[in-house]
From Swiss-Prot:
Location(s), subcellular: Cell membrane
Keyword field contains Iron: no
Organism: Mycoplasma pneumoniae (strain ATCC 29342 / M129 / Subtype 1)
Keyword Lipid biosynthesis: no
Name of the protein this chain belongs to: Uncharacterized protein MG350.1 homolog
Length: 225
């Protein structure tokens, strides 16, 4: 067993078949969601290469209805497939991969904590949203934004300390972070808002999806450890 999960089939052969088919279905849905989100243009966010990608909903479903390890496998598969339509944006794919790993891990963690209470999915997704927002906002300030600016030649180094100094004394850069003159203030203003919007949307879709899957399989499924 790989922690708490939803188990369906009593026979080993049936369980393996379900793992393969359900994981393949979730990967297909995740690919569709990720592909479509790449072409949805949102003012200002699109200029900063920020997309609202909800593919993590299906990775989370795989983590609970199959296993955490299978969810990680299809997360990697999703990232590799993303190079087909977004091959030049390796930093964005790296960020999405980290975000997907994190949201899957946080939902698993909070499910362990709130598995026995009512409205558990609401608690799980709400806390996972807050945790992922804090993690990814901080990571953007430390790594992603400096790396992105360095890759495109905006700054001479990817060291976040030096990048922050350059940003603070260069008004031209303030456009990228909502016009906030302080680097970390701008990072938290932009990426906190972006991640809250993104993962709130993931939660709004994820809660009914998880409840629907659980209800559909309820007679065959039970939470096991």
């Amino acid at each position: 067993m790989n922690g708490a999960r939803i188990a369906f089939w009593p026979k080993k052969e049936q369980h393996q078949l379900f793992n393969l088919s359900f994981s393949a279905m979730m990967l297909a849905l995740a690919l569709i969601a990720s592909f479509v989100s790449h072409f949805i243009s949102i003012p200002f966010l699109s200029a900063l290469k920020l997309t609202i990608d909800i593919s993590s909903v299906f990775l989370i479903a795989c983590a609970f209805f199959v296993s955490y390890s299978w969810a990680l496998v299809i997360t990697v598969a999703l990232s590799l497939c993303s190079f087909i339509w977004d091959g030049n944006n390796w930093i964005g794919i790296l960020t999405l991969t980290i975000a997907n790993f994190a949201i899957v891990s946080f939902t698993r963690l909070y499910f362990h904590i709130f598995a026995q209470i009512k409205l558990r999915w609401l608690w799980v997704f709400s806390l996972a949203t807050l945790s992922n927002t804090l993690l990814l906002t901080t990571l953007n300030g430390l790594l992603i934004t400096p790396l992105y600016w360095y890759w495109f030649g905006y700054v001479p180094t990817a060291n976040f300390v030096e990048v922050a100094k350059i940003y603070n004394k260069t008004p031209y850069f303030h456009f990228f972070l909502f016009g906030v003159p302080n680097y970390w203030g701008g990072i938290f203003a932009l990426y906190s808002l972006f991640n809250v919007i993104k993962f709130t949307l993931v939660s709004l879709i994820g809660v009914p999806v998880m409840r629907a899957f659980q209800k559909f399989y309820w007679k065959k499924a039970q939470i096991v450890y």
